[in-house]
């Protein structure tokens, strides 16, 4: 699995290398994006400042991998997932919404898909943030890289009485 090229920025999908998207892990790709850009997905950063756009694959077939595609969007790279979201094979909305979206895509109407992908982007960002929170080595790595306080370290210092103020 190739990592992001250290000399390229995330403003181009070619920074992800030539490895097919279906061979990659969602979590590893997002970790690479965060390391390269220095921006935490799922935080209080405005949408246009986030380095990538997270989308959901509208296909209703069984997903073969976590990631469907990594492609260059209009302004930033787009990562399309197939394991989570409001619509698609694993979607939370009723099946007829996914079928409606697929029908509209065939007619070159992307409005409903793009509208729901606004919410999918936020849901996927928060999903990644929750995963990171419960994987202590990853959360420690992120906190160290961003020069932020690590939650686990704070709890451990509190247990031995060194974190208390006063």
Where are these regions (language model features)?
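The feature captures two recurrent sequence modes
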Residues: 1-92, 100
